[in-house]
Regions:
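RNA-binding basic/glycine-rich loop and surface signature characteristic of RAMP-family CRISPR effectors
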Residues: 1-292
Length: 292
């Protein structure tokens, strides 16, 4: 078996998650690059959503022993507990660390951030309470529980990458144990299925965060191989020679047709993408072949 990695760089529409707020004001998480501000969906938020949606967290057990952490011991470790595939640090009775077999980047917006502020309140709830308790809403606002609030909002095209070290899936060196090849295939497939049909929720907004454009496959490079050559701006992919050369190293490109990109016809003509369903189907076949 060759020591290889599965890597994907994905472009999808999604809502940003939120950082610390100030009073009743919530701000989206952002990064600063080249003097500009870009909204993000953090890698922690993405990873948690993928682990939950894939069912990988279904067997999660948590213990609180000075710190809140995943339960790990000789009977429950990364070889037989899917929830531990994303890594763990156990400090009881001694410290044991098992790194994740896959890594995500933040999902960074393709275009600079434009502030869209939304204003809301709980008027209906406050009105119902005021009516039930004979309170004059306009005169006794605090007593009625009326609370205005506002938050920044960003739903935009974002780019992120995920890379698996395929030889670390299901392996726990802390307990010298390893999952079966069938279990390894199931774990990778579960995460791929979640990414293909990813749905994200934040502040009551349900996002269809399925991939619109995807580059990747299984290869020798244990890094986010396409991260530095996939560039989308103003809904247009920059089709460079470096991008084409990397695709020539045995990788594929998939697209969800529907006019999501201004130069969709150029992408189809120059990169010859396959459908999104075919991309994931072939990738799952590659994973099965790799482990078998």
């Amino acid at each position: 078996m060759k020591n290889k990695a599965l890597t994907m760089t994905i472009v999808a529409n999604m809502t940003s998650n939120y950082g610390e707020g100030l009073g009743n004001i919530s701000s989206v998480q952002k990064v600063f690059r080249n003097g500009k501000v870009y909204a993000i969906r953090s890698r922690e938020s993405l990873k948690n959503a993928i682990m939950v949606q894939s069912g990988m967290y279904d067997d999660l057990e948590v213990v609180v022993d000075g710190a809140t952490q995943k339960k790990v011991d000789e009977n429950k470790n990364a070889s037989n507990c899917r929830a531990l595939e994303g890594g763990y640090m156990s400090t009881s009775p001694t410290t044991k660390i098992r790194k994740s077999s896959f890594y995500l980047t933040d999902a960074v917006a393709c275009n600079e951030f434009i502030n869209e502020t939304r204003f809301h309140n709980n008027l209906y709830l406050a009105s119902s309470y005021a009516k039930a308790n004979d309170i004059k809403l306009k005169e006794e606002i605090k007593k009625s529980g009326l609370r205005p609030y506002q938050y920044e909002y960003d739903n935009s095209m974002k780019q992120y990458s995920i890379t698996f070290d395929l030889d670390k899936v299901g392996v726990d060196v802390n307990y010298d144990t390893e999952a079966s090849k069938e279990e390894k295939i199931l774990r990778v497939k579960a995460i791929l299925d979640a990414i293909e049909n990813l749905a994200l929720v934040v502040k009551g907004n349900l996002d269809n965060a399925e991939p619109l454009l995807i580059f990747g496959g299984i290869g020798d490079y244990k890094t986010h191989y396409f991260e530095n050559v996939v560039r989308v701006a103003r809904n247009e992919l920059d089709i460079t020679e470096d991008l084409k050369r990397r695709l020539d190293n045995g990788y594929r490109v998939g697209i969800l047709r529907g006019g999501n990109f201004e130069n969709e016809s150029d992408i189809i003509e120059e990169l010859k993408p396959i459908s999104m369903a075919e991309f994931f189907s072939k990738l799952e076949e590659d994973v099965k072949e790799y482990y078998e």
